[in-house]
Amino acid sequence: MSVRSLAGTNVAWDFVELPSQIMENWCWERSGLDLFAAHYETNERIPDELYEKMARARTYRAANAQMRQLGFAAADLALHQDYDSARDGDVMAYGREILQRHSSTKLPDDYAMLAGFGHLFAHPVGYAAGYYSYKWAEVLDADAFTRFKKEGITNPEV
């Protein structure tokens, strides 16, 4: 089997982020984490109490992260479909106004995140709409990981 043909952006855009997204699941399973997470000198595993705290904090601020992604999508769509410099003025102010609607805190007046959002505007491999494959990969990985959970996350048959 040619692994190179399945690497990086050599796959369909709606699949491109699945490998990285699904791998994160093993880090949240104790048996998966214990395969590699150990103190560099003593080889001691992460204490149960710390692991339990980590697991409880896993979704901390998840709503903020989701709203941030929705803001990126809304700004992307607005800039590519609706923005007119003669009508809407400064592009950074326009984008900031859209992003503000998706933020739980006030953005600074000089907030210029869009200027550095290379995924959409200046990515060397033409990522553009492929950026949103992260959200789709979260759906795919949640579905795919159920099989590993059911049959064992280290089961070589899966």
Please provide the spans of the model-predicted regions.
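Cation-handling catalytic/transport regions enriched in His/Asp/Glu
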Residues: 1-158
